[in-house]
Amino acid sequence: MAYRMQGSILEVCTCKVLCPCWIGEDPDGGTCDSTVAYHVDMGSVNDVDVSGLTLAVAVHIPGNVLKGNWRVMVFVDERATSQQEQALTQAFSGKLGGPLADFAQLFGEVVGVQRAPITFAVEQGKGHLQIGTSVDAELEPYLGTTGAPTTLHDTIFSTIAGAPAYVGKAPSFKMTNTGLGIDVDIQNHNAIQGSFLFEG
């Protein structure tokens, strides 16, 4: 097995709540500008320990999420050693096969890879995501009648059977990237946090 990683995924985007991409439908307005961050709680790639690190992408999705042709900027946690950075980028680029190769097939163009300080401080849909000077998002979950966070199960992005994805919104979401031609500054749009397990 080339890799095994388990942790939390966070997606913030320009779609309204709830982002249609999570059930395979077209994004609101026909396109979607999004940040997807993967924080690895525990994991290794080719025997390189990558626990505690985060890899994120800023993406422009030109249509239905499953049709691909995404334009992508990759951000690697600045705390990663050169060996850890290489391991993470190899896995998430699909070069090591498995489910991450399926994910990487959605990429049409990778415009660059950058090291950046990444803050991933989110629990049950509430918290903060910051990626250098490129992304800053505050996150709030929706709550059900019992006061517990509203959740989704078995979405197209689910990799752990039965694991919840917490439905929320971003009171503030800012994302700028000249390589992607993105300049977003919006309020109260989609934010979803879930769990992932990748083995390949």
What residue ranges belong to the model's regions?
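N-terminal ordered "arm"
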Residues: 2-45
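Sterically constrained small-residue positions within well-ordered secondary structures
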Residues: 6, 29, 65, 120-122
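Short amphipathic beta-strand and strand-loop transition segments with alternating hydrophobic
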Residues: 21, 57-59, 116-121
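Extended, charged low-complexity segments
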Residues: 142-200
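Low-complexity, flexible helical/coil segments
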Residues: 47-54, 74, 108-114, 156-158, ...
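Charged linear interaction tracts used for macromolecular binding and regulation
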Residues: 70, 74-152, 158
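Generic structural motif
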Residues: 18-20, 41-45, 60, 77-79, ...
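Aromatic- and glycine-enriched beta-alpha-beta binding-site module
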Residues: 32-101
